[in-house]
Regions:
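C-terminal alpha-helical cap of glycosyltransferases
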Residues: 348-377
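Conserved nucleotide-cofactor-binding alpha/beta core module
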Residues: 1-127, 134-142, 210-349
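A conserved mid-protein helix/loop that constitutes part of the nucleotide-sugar donor-binding site
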Residues: 22-30, 190-203
Length: 379
């Protein structure tokens, strides 16, 4: 690709089909708003047309240009990017639904970065960098990634420090929860629930009398299957409560009625983990080896709750039981989480923006100085 003269501002292209009320944009919107517009020019390439909502309006208003490319071909989008002289193209999708990865195969920008949407390597030499952290990709795991790694100093995941939690006060009765009894919660999508995770959950429910498991209702088929599997394991199906979908701010508010978020593995919570932590609900996770199995651990480390990260299934089960069986311990953890939220890095969007902008400046300068692409650590 022919090298252009540097723009006065570093021109960043963000590419996604999810600039709307979607998990990705809930995390990213405040980053777009916080970007230093005196140093960076932001251009959005939206792969999806659709009605406006509050998040889409916030996102589109934060860009210098917001371009709907839904009807354009991959080749046309790639050429448009080159015509606009994008310096750094940030792919927010990877291989997730409605992606347009061929845009990057055709080299839409001299520097191409994989971030957030896809929890792993692209496996392609067309992507130069992947944004991660030391929890997600330990040094010994770098060999499994085709990209060079941009290591953020804390968690790789940005969050919206202005995210709204509804003032609505739900009662347990209206949400189908018992007035008494411990509420285990997991609002991950049901495809993440593996048989061996479900085995552990059912054993925990047998050990904690009167406890219930609160899950998201994905589909009637999923509800029926999980109820059948609970019965097979000797747990009454009506002890599994399914939460209907609701607006995001109210969904965050209803987290207050849960006692403990118990994570899935090997595919752990991502946005759902930060949802829980933002709502002051502790999360117990089991860290694995892959990127997708280490995200909750990254978030818990950044919020100062690494003691909730376990390494084995037995540790996961025993720590969860210990917390569920000890009200004072649970209260101590919740107090620590509430205390840490305003002072730790996880929900500090301003600090995250400063760090990612430092990364963009470094990779831009290296490109124009003909320095080879290599791993970068932001401090």
């Amino acid at each position: 690709m022919q090298k252009n003269k540097p723009n006065k501002k570093i021109r960043i292209g963000y590419y996604s089909a999810d600039f709307r009320a979607h998990a990705m944009s809930y995390l990213l919107v405040n980053l777009f708003e916080q970007h230093d517009k005196s140093k960076f020019e932001l251009i959005a390439f939206s792969f999806r047309s659709g009605k406006n909502d509050e998040i889409k309006n916030r996102v589109s208003n934060s860009f210098d240009k917001f371009i709907d490319v839904n009807l354009k071909s991959d080749k046309e989008i790639s050429q448009l990017s080159r015509d606009l002289k994008i310096d750094i193209a940030v792919d927010l999708m990877g291989f997730t639904q409605n992606n347009r990865f061929n845009i990057f195969v055709q080299r839409c920008a001299p520097i191409q970065v994989n971030y957030l949407g896809y929890p792993g390597t692209s496996g392609s030499n067309c992507i130069d960098y992947l944004i991660a952290d030391k929890i997600l990709i330990p040094k010994q795991n770098q060999k499994y990634f085709s990209e060079k790694i941009i290591y953020m100093p804390d968690s790789y995941q940005v969050n919206d420090s202005k995210r709204k939690i509804s003032d609505k006060v739900f009662t347990k009765k209206e949400l189908g929860l018992p007035e008494d009894g411990f509420v285990f919660c997991c609002f991950n999508q049901s495809y993440k629930i593996t048989p061996y995770v479900f085995d552990i959950w059912m054993r925990l429910m047998k050990r904690i009398d009167g406890s219930v498991l609160w899950l998201i209702k994905d589909s009637d088929i999923g509800v029926n299957n999980l109820k059948k599997e609970a019965q097979k394991r000797g747990v009454e199906p009506d002890r599994i409560i399914f939460a209907d979908k609701m607006s995001n701010d109210e969904h965050l508010a209803r987290h207050r009625l849960a006692d403990l978020f118990i994570d899935t593995f090997p595919y752990t919570a991502h946005t759902t983990c930060s949802d829980a932590l933002w709502s002051s609900l502790p999360v117990v996770t089991r860290i694995g080896q892959s990127f997708a199995s280490r995200v909750s651990a990254s978030l818990l480390t950044a919020i100062g709750l690494s003691e909730l990260i376990t390494k084995t299934e037995k540790e996961y089960e025993e720590l969860t039981f210990k917390i569920a069986n000890n009200k004072s311990l649970l209260n101590e953890i919740k107090k620590k989480l509430t205390k840490n939220k305003p002072i730790k890095s996880l929900f500090n969007t301003k600090l995250f923006t400063k760090n990612i902008e430092s990364a963009f400046v470094i990779i831009h300068e290296r490109y124009h100085s003909n320095i080879l692409v290599k791993n970068i650590e932001i401090k």
